[in-house]
Regions:
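Catalytic center-proximal scaffold of phosphoryl-transfer enzymes
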Residues: 1-173
Length: 173
């Protein structure tokens, strides 16, 4: 019999006190889509344990130095920083010259599906509207679609999920 009490049913959540979060950055020049399993071209990895703001700054400094040594930065228009929106990842857009943060597709899809899964027959239509707004870079339209989903959502728990998805997508625009 499991011991499940404290504020709610489920696993007892303990604070993480002795965890280390390694950081991983990889640079590539494109994607080879010839095979079923796509391959990143001219791949270079940076990684390790970089603790705190100073550690993250050190990591991005290493990445920036590699970019400057390997590429003619006068011809670079943008350096896309692709990730899940974690603060340390977004900070790459500040530390890397011409850096621009872009939410990765996996997390974007994950949150759009969370926001629309309860819509049954209308889920595909709602997803299409959100994706269309993203492709067209129409943040206001995406917000309007999320607001409409919130209006037609009955369950309070599901409304919280939709709101969290809306905040995540629009917050990482």
């Amino acid at each position: 019999v499991s011991l499940q009490y404290i504020n709610e049913k489920g696993d007892i959540k303990k604070p993480r006190t002795n965890t280390i979060m390694p950081r991983l950055v990889y640079i590539y020049e494109g994607v080879d889509r010839e095979n079923k399993r796509h391959e990143l071209l001219t791949l270079k990895h940076f990684g390790g344990v970089y603790e705190g703001a100073k550690g993250v700054e050190t990591l991005w400094k290493e990445v920036g130095e590699y970019i400057e040594e390997s590429y003619d930065t006068d011809y670079l228009e943008k350096v896309y920083i692709n990730g899940d929106g974690a603060g340390w990842i977004k900070s790459g857009a500040v530390h890397i010259e011409k850096g621009k943060f872009v939410l990765d597709r996996f997390h974007m899809h994950k949150y759009i599906i969370k926001a629309t899964s309860h819509l049954m027959d209308s889920a595909d239509d709602a997803r299409s509207e959100i994706y269309r707004a993203i492709r067209r870079k129409e943040k206001h339209t995406a917000e309007t679609v999320f607001n409409h989903i919130l209006e037609i959502t009955d369950s309070e728990a599901k409304r919280k999920t939709v709101q969290a998805s809306k905040d995540y997508i629009l917050g990482n625009w």
